[in-house]
UniProtKB/Swiss-Prot annotation:
The keyword DNA-binding applies. Has 3 domains, the large (RuvB-L) and small ATPase (RuvB-S) domains and the C-terminal head (RuvB-H) domain. The head domain binds DNA, while the ATPase domains jointly bind ATP, ADP or are empty depending on the state of the subunit in the translocation cycle. During a single DNA translocation step the structure of each domain remains the same, but their relative positions change. The RuvA-RuvB-RuvC complex processes Holliday junction (HJ) DNA during genetic recombination and DNA repair, while the RuvA-RuvB complex plays an important role in the rescue of blocked DNA replication forks via replication fork reversal (RFR). RuvA specifically binds to HJ cruciform DNA, conferring on it an open structure. The RuvB hexamer acts as an ATP-dependent pump, pulling dsDNA into and through the RuvAB complex. RuvB forms 2 homohexamers on either side of HJ DNA bound by 1 or 2 RuvA tetramers; 4 subunits per hexamer contact DNA at a time. It comes from Hydrogenovibrio crunogenus (strain DSM 25203 / XCL-2) (Thiomicrospira crunogena). The gene is ruvB. One of its GO terms (molecular function) is four-way junction DNA binding. DNA binds at residues 294, 313, 318. Transmembrane segments: none annotated. This is Holliday junction branch migration complex subunit RuvB. Homohexamer. Forms an RuvA(8)-RuvB(12)-Holliday junction (HJ) complex. HJ DNA is sandwiched between 2 RuvA tetramers; dsDNA enters through RuvA and exits via RuvB. An RuvB hexamer assembles on each DNA strand where it exits the tetramer. Each RuvB hexamer is contacted by two RuvA subunits (via domain III) on 2 adjacent RuvB subunits; this complex drives branch migration. In the full resolvosome a probable DNA-RuvA(4)-RuvB(12)-RuvC(2) complex forms which resolves the HJ.
């Protein structure tokens, strides 16, 4: 998938795994942005600690790169317990889940990324574990098989997903705390860039941090990734200081424009304008013309374009807006202006 090649993609890249933990906040007061989510979690954590109970199960959903994994770490740190991490695709059989659950200590946090990808048979084991802190294990085979209930310690399940609509209702209803993570403001991202630069021992001027923030598509993971690229440019082409000019030159070299669009975003918009003459276009036609999978276009490329007002999803297909024409320096045909 193209997401693995995009510096402005929200999904985690291999390079992020080595650097991201060093800049990740460990306590909730260091976490920038998502004020409503922070306040709700802080309140729930404090209440659970006062009662000396486990925290209620937490579901975090929203676009990739907004801090779901970071929040799971913070929850465990604030509760003073161990964090166990896994993901939906890894838990293939009920036995895999049972092995994880039986190793938990009281009040531990179990973080399941991509929880929407759990299989139905695994979910069936998870339901009693979440509600009653028990799991049913089948011992034996055939007529001799019997179900045995095993008690497990009270724990907190933190589920993360970018596709909340794919969660089954029974699973979603078992989460006591459900929070959506929103895209970050430019000001919040500038704070994150400045904080990360300080941790990494970099010198970043406020205008330099702001320039990186503007092109980060509202996503901290992208902001930190762009910061590392600008750092390289500043050290090789400049004096090591990240200024607005250095950030602009570095990001232009990476083909990330002032609004955070990359060449794949522009390619999609130009395709709709030039090849399809701005008419409504179905997703399958776009997929064939771009040579990309439908899911990649829907989940990776389109969301940011829709959020920024460059693209509209209609029952008849995808339509490019006047905003997209202006951004690309093109004049919108009169018939399209009338349609808008």
């Amino acid at each position: 998938m193209i997401e693995t090649d995009r510096i402005v993609g929200g999904q985690s890249l291999e390079e992020d795994m080595y650097v991201q933990p060093t800049v990740r906040p460990q306590i909730i007061t260091d976490y920038i942005g998502q004020q409503a989510v922070r306040e709700q979690l802080q309140l729930s954590i404090n209440a659970a600690k006062m009662r000396q109970e486990h925290l209620d199960h937490v579901l975090l959903y929203g676009p990739p790169g907004l801090g779901k994994t970071t929040l799971s770490n913070i929850i465990a740190q604030e509760m003073g317990v161990t964090l166990r991490q896994t993901s939906g695709p890894v838990i293939e059989k009920p036995g895999d889940l049972a092995a994880i659950l039986t190793r938990l200590e009281p009040h531990d946090v179990l973080f399941v990324d991509e929880i929407h990808r759990l299989s139905p048979i695994v979910e069936e084991v998870l339901y009693p574990a979440m509600e009653d802190f028990q799991i049913d294990i089948i011992i034996g085979e055939g007529p001799a098989a019997q179900s045995v209930k095993i008690d497990i310690p009270p724990f907190t399940l933190v589920g993360a997903t970018t596709r909340a609509g794919l969660l089954t209702s029974p699973l979603r209803d078992r989460f006591g705390i459900v929070q959506r993570l929103e895209f970050y403001s430019i000001e919040e991202l500038a704070q994150i860039v400045t904080r990360s630069a300080n941790i990494l021992g970099l010198s970043a001027e406020p205008d330099g941090a702001l320039e990186i923030a503007r092109r980060s598509r509202g996503t901290p993971r992208i902001a930190n990734r762009l910061l590392r690229r600008v750092r390289d440019y500043a050290q090789v082409k400049g004096n090591g200081v990240i200024t607005a000019e250095i950030a602009d030159l570095a990001l232009n070299l990476l083909e990330v424009d002032p609004l955070g669009l990359d060449k794949m975003d522009r390619r999609l918009l130009e395709l709709l304008i030039q090849k399809f003459e701005s008419r409504p276009v179905g997703i399958d036609s776009i997929s064939a013309a771009l040579g990309e999978e439908r899911g990649t276009i829907e989940d990776v490329i389109e969301p940011f374009l829709v959020q920024q007002g460059f693209l509209i999803r209609t029952p008849r297909g995808r339509v490019v807006t006047q905003t997209a024409y202006r951004h690309l320096g093109l004049t919108m045909p009169e018939r399209n202006l009338e349609d808008e």
